[in-house]
């Protein structure tokens, strides 16, 4: 079973600004969500990579791709994507907190409980 949003973030809460996305990016995010929900992580990753090519600085795309990479067991890339998302998520505290939550999960998977605790603290500070 996939964990949806990080704890403390309502499911889909980080994607509340969907309406602001371009049509193709929004369509790819929707497709990726359906693929991920159906257990097709490779398909979801592929859809999100396409969305990233269209909107390389959209933190929602980076968040979702980090989430999929984490579910695929690629914690190092998940952390990298979430950190990149943070650089573009200024002024969006819920999204920033969600990205920090993903970083915490990624660090835990990489055997870094101290780094995970720091990321969780950062998520709390952000909100």
Task: Enumerate the predicted regions with their spans.
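Alpha-helical segment of the N-proximal tetratricopeptide repeat
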Residues: 18-46
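Canonical positions in the second alpha-helix
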Residues: 51, 84-85, 89, 122-123
């Amino acid at each position: 079973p996939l964990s949806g949003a990080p704890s403390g973030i309502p499911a889909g809460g980080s994607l509340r600004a969907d309406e602001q996305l371009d049509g193709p990016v929004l369509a790819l995010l929707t497709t990726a969500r359906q693929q991920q929900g159906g257990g097709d992580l490779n398909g979801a990753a592929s859809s999100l990579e396409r969305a990233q090519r269209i909107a390389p600085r959209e933190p929602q795309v980076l968040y979702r791709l980090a989430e999929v990479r984490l579910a695929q067991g690629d914690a190092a890339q998940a952390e990298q994507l979430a950190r990149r998302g943070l650089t573009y998520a200024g002024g969006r505290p819920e999204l920033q907190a969600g990205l920090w939550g993903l970083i915490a999960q990624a660090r835990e998977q990489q055997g870094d409980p101290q780094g995970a605790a720091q990321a969780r603290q950062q998520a709390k500070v952000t909100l």
